[in-house]
C-alpha cells in the first residue's frame, strides 16, 4: 500500500487520506468534528489534501460549550473565514438555556450534557451517519482499543465487545438507519507524530500550545489559566503570571497548563521527546471516576 522508502509520517498521511476517501464512498452525510486543537488542525489539513483540488465535501462541526479559551474562538473563526468550508456551531439547547457550567454543576455532569449530549443532539439534528474525530490510540487506554471505524448504535452508544474486525485497510461501514460511525483517521498517530507533521507541513495552530506568560491559579497542585472572570477565587488564593503552555485543549476550567519554555514547534518536539506522561493528564474530565473515558465513550462521547 505504501511506496518503497516512504517515511513513517508520509505513511501515516497516506493511511489517513485513504480513510477519509473511504468514508466518502461508504456514507451519505459525513461530518468532521472540529475541536480547534492540534489534532483537529492536522485532520483538517489532511482533509484538504484528500480532496484537492476540490473542496472538502463535508462540513466541520464544533460542539460549543461556551467555555473554550478566547484564543480558541478567535482561531476557529479565523479558520472558518479563510477556508472554503462550512462550519456548523452547535450548543446543547437545554444546557445552554440552564446556564450549565463546570463550577456549579461539576465537570462530569457538565461534560455529559454540554459535550456528549450536545454531540448526540447535533448528529440527530443534521442526520450525520459518520463523524470524523481526532482521537489517537496513544492518548488514553480506552482509545487504544477502539477501532478506526467505531460503530455507534441508535442511541450513539459504543460497546467495545461488539467492535468490528479491521483486517489490513478493510473497514466495515454497514449501518442501519439511525446508527452512525465515528471515524478516527489519526488512530495510529502519536503526539510526537502530530507535532512533527505540523512542523513538516507548516500547519497553523492555536497559540495556546506555545509557552507564554499567562495569569495562572495553582489549586490542588494543578495550574489553571484564568481566561475570564467566571471562576471564583478564594480569599487565600493568588493569581500569578507564569510561563506556561498547553499539551491539550478543552474547556478552560477543566484543562491544566504546564510550565514550559517551548515557544515554537521545534521546542515542543524536543519537549515531547522526553516527556513521560500522556497529554490527557491535563484533562480533568478523564479522572472524575474509574475508567472515566471509557464510560463517557460508551455513553456517546467523542
Curated annotation (Swiss-Prot):
Similarity comment text for this entry: Belongs to the PAPS reductase family. CysD subfamily.
The record's listing under NCBIfam families reads: CysD (TIGR02039), PRK05253.1 (NF003587), PRK12563.1 (NF009214)
According to UniProt, the name of this protein is Sulfate adenylyltransferase subunit 2
- State which Enzyme Commission number(s) the record gives: 2.7.7.4
Q: Which reaction does it catalyse?
A: sulfate + ATP + H(+) = adenosine 5'-phosphosulfate + diphosphate
Subunit: Heterodimer composed of CysD, the smaller subunit, and CysN.
Task: State its role.
Answer: With CysN forms the ATP sulfurylase (ATPS) that catalyzes the adenylation of sulfate producing adenosine 5'-phosphosulfate (APS) and diphosphate, the first enzymatic step in sulfur assimilation pathway. APS synthesis involves the formation of a high-energy phosphoric-sulfuric acid anhydride bond driven by GTP hydrolysis by CysN coupled to ATP hydrolysis by CysD.
Q: Name one Pfam family in it.
A: PAPS_reduct
Question: Which classification does the entry list for the species?
Answer: Bacteria, Pseudomonadati, Pseudomonadota, Gammaproteobacteria, Enterobacterales
Keyword 4Fe-4S assigned? no
- Which GO annotations describe the biological process of this protein? hydrogen sulfide biosynthetic process; sulfate assimilation
EC main group? transferase
One GO molecular-function annotation for this sequence? sulfate adenylyltransferase (ATP) activity
Question: Organism's domain of life?
Answer: Bacteria
Q: Which UniProt keywords apply?
A: ATP-binding, Nucleotide-binding, Nucleotidyltransferase, Transferase
Pathway, per record: Sulfur metabolism; hydrogen sulfide biosynthesis; sulfite from sulfate: step 1/3
